[in-house]
Amino acid sequence: MGLRKLSIANVDLKDKRVLMRVDFNVPMKDGKVTNTQRIVGASPTIKYALDKGAKSIVLMSHLGGRVGNKVARYSLNPVGEEVSKLLGKPVKFLPDCVGPETTEGMCQSSAGSVFLLENLRFHVEEEGKGVSPTGEKIKATPEQVKAFSENLTKLGDVYLNDAFGTAHRAHASMVGCRLTQRACGFLMDKELTYFSKLLDQPQHPFLAIIGGAKVSDKIQLIKNMLDKVDELIITGGMAFTFLKKLHNMKIGKSLYDEPGAAIVDEWMQLAKSKNVKIHLPVDFITGDKFAEDANTGTATVEPGIRDTHMGLDGGPKTMEEFCKVISRAKTIVWNGPMGVFEMEKFAGGTKAAMDAVVAATTKGVTNNNGGGDTATCCPKWKTEAQVSHVSTGVGASLELLEGKQLPGILALSDA
């Protein structure tokens, strides 16, 4: 899939109605936004469109999971207040995203007006399926989805997409707005630029760090990475499946993925055939339970982890070796932490890896830190500005790394 798409910087926005898909799926508590990071992320694109003389900007987003009907707690109205504060100008909230009330609400607007539509997922047509007010599963017909998409399209002259986090979803607002110019906002453009560097033009040695609980969750990712990388670190809970399968290691109460174990030998043979060097942990920090107050211990591959304990982090020898591997890489993809970094007793391995990636970044190494847990590591240690890129889309970034086609990107105009 080509990642070179039309950028907002190459679109004439003067006197145009700009229809912009954003990701304002923000955390809420008691009707208030508790984290504005995603709103802040979209603001450069919104401000740029205003500066370039856009007639109006129509913002559309989802909030919450699959809905299919109007649910008060998922209203985007409180988000509009935060957007207004950030822009320093009024943002008119519209109580629906399509229909006569929406179009009438935009009439007689002054130049540079900003509108925020109500939650797209209040309409079952956005995702194609949802839940009725009485709790029954419902589906939209293709004709209904098409009509919904066309009604959204009528609200703009130019379509911008800055919602990388939903780029892997073939939802109406992502793929159905068939305006002549369909461009990336700055946030989307940044994501695509970094992934293009990583996947199409990587500098070598190219290293992938892949963690997570289950091997079976990362099958497609590992398979695709083996075609691209020079070295691969297998870490986190999934490492125990490799170690038990390959070395008959005693892993105690550690995670073991039986379905994933069935393909470990095949992967090792594939890696060997492609001259990819695989690195696995050699020692561990263990705990007698999955809890902050666990009694800790240490273990090595031989004699293994005792029956009462589980491996919850990489040990010092492991991290010394992994950091050496990181230090010689020129391109790094990191998807999955070294251990249970949310618990301080088991955060040392991930922190050591983060420090090594930060050090590599200062030397010009391109790196992408994606996956929900890995992306969370950066705010924990305040390293967002010290690494090349922290992806804003967990599912979207994983599917790109897996080599999949993303509907929301395919729908954009080519550069």
Swiss-Prot record:
Positions contributing to (2R)-3-phosphoglycerate binding: 22-25, 37-38, 61-62, 64, 120-121, 168-169
Cofactor(s) recorded in Swiss-Prot or TrEMBL: Mg(2+)
Annotated GO biological process: gluconeogenesis; glycolytic process
Residues holding CDP: 212, 217, 236, 336, 341
GO terms under cellular component: cytosol
Keyword Glycoprotein attributed: no
EC number: 2.7.2.3
Gene3D superfamilies: Phosphoglycerate kinase, N-terminal domain (3.40.50.1260)
Protein name from the UniProt record: Phosphoglycerate kinase
The species this protein was found in: Opisthorchis sinensis (Clonorchis sinensis)
